[in-house]
Design a protein with these regions (language model features):
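Aromatic-rich, lipid-facing transmembrane alpha helices and their immediate juxtamembrane interface loops
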Residues: 3-148
Length: 148
C-alpha cells in the first residue's frame, strides 16, 4: 500500500485531494457532534477535517504501523489539536464551544482523559475511512491495516 498513493488517478492534485479529505472529515465530525451533543460549531468542521487529514497521513509516515499504534498516534494528535484550538476558540475568543472543566483529568477545561479514549476509537475509524475514501474517490490502493 505504501508508495502506491501517488498519481493513482489523474485529475486530482494533492491540494484537491487534501481539501476533499478535510471536507469529508469535517462533515463527518460535525455529524458525530450533532448525534452526541445535538449541536456543533463551524470551528469543529475545520478541526475535525484537519484531524481526519492528519490521521490519514499516518500511513505515509508510518507505513507498517498496526492499527493500535495509528489509533494511539491519532488520539494524541487530536488531543494536541483540540487543546490548541480550545485555547484560541474558547479561551482567547471566548466562544464557549466546549468546556471539559467538569470532566476528570482535564487540562484548562480544553482536553480531558475520558474524551482522549474516545478520540482513539474515532481515530481507528478515521484510519480505515481515509483509506476507503482514497480508494473510492482517487483510485488509490486499499488494504485493511494490520491489527498487531
Amino acid at each position: 500500500k505504501y508508495g502506491q498513493r501517488k498519481n493513482a488517478r489523474r485529475g486530482w492534485g494533492d491540494v484537491g485531494k487534501n481539501l476533499v479529505l478535510i471536507g469529508c472529515g469535517g462533515a463527518l465530525y460535525v455529524l458525530v457532534e450533532l448525534c452526541y451533543r445535538g449541536r456543533s460549531h463551524g470551528s469543529m468542521f475545520l478541526l475535525g477535517g484537519v484531524c481526519f487529514w492528519l490521521i490519514g497521513l499516518l500511513d505515509e509516515v508510518f507505513p507498517n504501523a498496526p492499527l493500535g499504534v495509528q489509533m494511539a498516534l491519532g488520539a494524541w494528535g487530536i488531543v494536541c489539536m483540540e487543546f490548541l484550538t480550545g485555547l484560541v476558540v474558547n479561551r482567547w475568543l471566548r466562544l464557549g464551544v466546549w468546556d471539559y472543566s467538569a470532566q476528570p483529568h482535564n487540562l484548562l477545561g480544553q482536553v480531558c482523559l475520558p474524551f482522549a479514549a474516545w478520540w482513539a476509537v474515532l481515530a481507528g475509524a478515521a484510519v480505515i475511512l481515509d483509506d476507503l475514501l482514497r480508494f473510492a474517490l482517487f483510485g488509490e490502493a486499499f488494504a485493511l491495516p494490520r491489527l498487531f
